[in-house]
Design a protein with these regions (language model features):
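Intracellular effector-coupling site of seven-transmembrane GPCRs
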Residues: 142-194
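Loop architecture of class A 7-transmembrane GPCRs
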Residues: 18-35, 39-40, 62, 68, ...
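Structural signature of the GPCR N-terminal helical module
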Residues: 1-30, 36-37, 43-61, 79, ...
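Internal alpha-helical transmembrane segments of multi-pass membrane proteins, especially GPCRs
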Residues: 1, 42, 74, 78, ...
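Helix-loop boundary elements of multi-pass alpha-helical membrane proteins
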Residues: 54-75, 145, 167-176
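Hydrophobic alpha-helical segments of membrane proteins
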Residues: 5, 9-12, 86-89, 93, ...
């Protein structure tokens, strides 16, 4: 939610730049603030999605402890933002860290001057969350499969119902797999091209 609000607050600046034929009218400080806010919000959004996948996995693995996890959501969110702001604030020590990206009508990291930063940013805020998301949803799918097998063993009473119940379990597993594929797919479609483009431009 905070990520979306932060990104939304920066949209008027880009609109003004488009209207002004690509001229940035908010000064160097405005560009730094805007570039930092957009970068931090994108990173926080990736990690938030990652934490959601971990929370879902824990909820399935330990259903009776789910209420305990919910109580700590606020504190986890604070730690998340502290982590994101801490490693993104490194660039604030450099005057030319954020510049106007003319093709996008917005301010962002100075990719050409600080390629190492872009590489590390992609590793920490794109690759690592993606690995965790893929891993947790694969584990979720395996847990659903195991759970369905246990239900099948405990509920099958006769040969006549066995086939129907197994078909139902297979259908449930397939639907769970589709959800996993959709979530991971959307994440990758949204962020991998952006990350690859930044890396290619930096190198």
């Amino acid at each position: 939610m905070m990520c979306d609000l932060l990104l939304g607050a920066m949209i008027p600046l880009s609109i003004n730049t488009i209207i002004s034929d690509g001229e940035w009218k908010f000064g160097d400080i405005g560009c730094t603030i805007s570039g930092f806010a957009i970068t931090a919000a994108n990173c926080a959004a990736n990690w938030a999605l990652c934490l959601v996948s971990v929370e879902r996995y824990l909820a399935i693995l330990y259903p009776f402890n789910h209420s305990v996890y919910v109580q700590y959501v606020k504190y986890i969110s604070i730690v998340l933002w502290f982590f994101v702001l801490a490693h993104n604030s490194v660039m604030l020590h450099y005057d030319d860290a954020f510049i106007l990206i003319e093709d996008m009508y917005m301010c962002g990291p100075n990719i050409r001057s600080y390629p190492l930063y872009i590489v590390l940013l992609n590793l920490f805020d794109l690759v690592l969350p993606n690995i965790i998301i893929v891993y947790t949803y694969i584990k979720i799918h395996k847990e659903v499969q195991r759970h369905n097998r246990e239900i099948a063993v405990n509920t099958l009473r006769s040969t006549s119902t066995k086939g129907d119940d197994l078909d139902m379990n297979s259908s449930t597993e397939w639907k769970a797999a589709l959800v996993i594929i959709a979530i991971v797919g959307v994440f990758n479609v949204c962020w991998i091209p952006f990350g690859v483009g930044m890396l290619a431009y930096a190198l």
